[in-house]
């Protein structure tokens, strides 16, 4: 989003007007954040530029919105004047959008102005750590080919046309979730698996300002559902919640717009953004996927790239030979999004793909309560832990943030059996680029 207003008046070059970048986690979408000019990303960090004379006020505002500042960095006035930023430790797709730059999740990445929106990948990085038993762990940080970032920005979005809008929740399920396919003909909107795009809904907010963009994980591979490089798809749930004061039902602006949009309608699209959830290039990598609800979107892109015949034909350089395991949490069986696709892959590739459901309102955990995804992880924690220890294994978590604590507890118990402290081991996984999280 090329929107300097998103950073509350950054870049005054007068004396004493130094600009700082706050890295913030835990921001939640609510009425007050809806009045800001930057989106609250589903996961990771939000980066906010703050002039020196507003640092205290911004700290108070962030605290009020439920955020926590985890780092503060400086941006020189000279860099602001030149329109450049060398602080590229951006770890979140919303930050990319707000800054109109690409990012790297764990490694600083500078955007090459001659690369037309493609950010150069970080160099391969060897991380040598010792586990709790003193054994050296050498892990290679994943390398990726050039990743397209911010090819279309809010001030000049791509205008896509809706091809189809299909329901994903079966009869008897809860809520509205749609699979929406857009025509990309006539543009240059390239993307890869694990990225997101921004959607700008029409109209203005209650303050009379144009609606802000919202970010959605892409649900199709780089070649599109038709494997013709002409489409992009989203998996969107209509946001619905009770107003905390009035008790009235409130519907999300953009999600309602998308879930009810008609084929043939034109939509403003920005992006793509994101590097946190990219699939490793190594076809022999193992991939653990832990998802709830629409968090299945990036997982679908991975599975299509790995197993769909047309995709494999379109990607002769990537023929998946590893092992993948999806643990998918939903409330009811009719809420298993893409159920037929998932089970078809499982039947066709039983040696390479394992599918496990956690159906909270139909299944019980060992304590007699509802079976949530973290309960399934606990059930299979020893197996998952052994797989995670393999240096070729990447773990992806996408969906509700509430599952993270339970997942960590389960893996902590499994690791402890071998004298390993999970929290330390997890840090090494993150540094090695093998632990990928996008939760909200």
UniProtKB/Swiss-Prot annotation:
GO terms for molecular function: ferredoxin-NADP+ reductase activity. Its main location: membrane. Keywords: Antenna complex, FAD, Flavoprotein, Membrane, NADP, Oxidoreductase, Phycobilisome, Thylakoid. Residues 93-142 are annotated as: Disordered. FAD binds at residues 214-217, 235-237, 241, 253-255, 294. It catalyses: 2 reduced [2Fe-2S]-[ferredoxin] + NADP(+) + H(+) = 2 oxidized [2Fe-2S]-[ferredoxin] + NADPH. NADP(+) binds at residues 217, 237, 294, 330-331, 360-361, 370-374, 399-400, 438. Residues 17-75 form the CpcD-like domain. Pfam families: CpcD, NAD_binding_1. Residues 155-279 form the FAD-binding FR-type domain. It is a peripheral membrane protein. This is Ferredoxin--NADP reductase. It comes from Trichormus variabilis (strain ATCC 29413 / PCC 7937) (Anabaena variabilis). The gene is petH.
């Amino acid at each position: 989003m090329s929107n300097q207003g998103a950073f509350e008046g950054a870049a005054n070059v007068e004396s004493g007007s130094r600009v700082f970048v706050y890295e913030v986690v835990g921001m939640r979408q609510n009425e007050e954040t809806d009045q800001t000019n930057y989106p609250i990303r589903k996961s990771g960090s939000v980066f906010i530029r703050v002039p020196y004379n507003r640092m205290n006020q911004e700290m108070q505002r962030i605290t009020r919105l439920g955020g926590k500042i985890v780092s503060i960095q400086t941006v020189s006035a000279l860099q602001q004047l030149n329109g450049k930023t060398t602080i590229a430790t951006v770890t979140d797709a919303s930050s990319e959008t707000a800054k109109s730059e690409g990012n790297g999740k764990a490694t600083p990445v500078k955007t090459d102005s001659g690369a037309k929106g493609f950010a150069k990948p970080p160099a391969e990085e060897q991380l040598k750590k010792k586990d709790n038993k003193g054994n050296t762990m050498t892990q290679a940080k994943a390398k990726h080919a050039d990743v397209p970032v911010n090819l279309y920005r809010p001030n000049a979005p791509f205008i896509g046309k809706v091809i189809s809008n299909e329901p994903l929740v079966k009869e008897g399920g809860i809520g509205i979730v749609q699979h929406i396919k857009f025509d990309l003909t006539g543009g240059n909107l390239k993307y890869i698996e694990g990225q997101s795009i921004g959607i700008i809904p029409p109209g203005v907010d209650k303050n009379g300002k144009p609606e802000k963009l919202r970010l959605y994980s892409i649900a199709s591979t780089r070649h599109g559902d038709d494997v013709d490089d002409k489409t992009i798809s989203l998996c969107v749930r209509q946001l619905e919640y009770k107003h905390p004061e009035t008790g009235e039902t409130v519907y999300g602006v953009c999600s309602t717009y998308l879930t009810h949009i008609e084929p043939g309608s034109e939509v403003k699209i920005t992006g793509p953004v994101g590097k946190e959830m990219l699939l490793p290039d190594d076809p022999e990598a193992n991939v653990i996927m832990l998802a709830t609800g629409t968090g299945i979107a990036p997982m679908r892109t991975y599975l299509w790239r790995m197993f769909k015949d047309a995709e494999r034909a379109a990607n002769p350089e990537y023929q998946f030979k590893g092992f993948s395991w999806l643990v998918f949490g939903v409330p009811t069986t009719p809420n298993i999004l893409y159920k037929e696709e998932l089970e078809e892959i499982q039947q066709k590739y039983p040696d390479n793909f394992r599918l496990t459901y956690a159906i909270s309102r139909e299944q019980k955990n060992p304590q007699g309560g509802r079976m949530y995804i973290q309960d399934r992880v606990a059930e299979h924690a020893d197996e998952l832990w052994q797989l995670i220890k393999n240096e070729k294994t990447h773990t992806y978590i996408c969906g509700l943030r509430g599952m993270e604590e339970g997942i960590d507890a389960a893996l902590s118990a499994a690791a402890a059996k071998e004298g390993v402290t999970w929290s330390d081991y997890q840090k090494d996984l993150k540094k090695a680029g093998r632990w990928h999280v996008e939760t909200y």
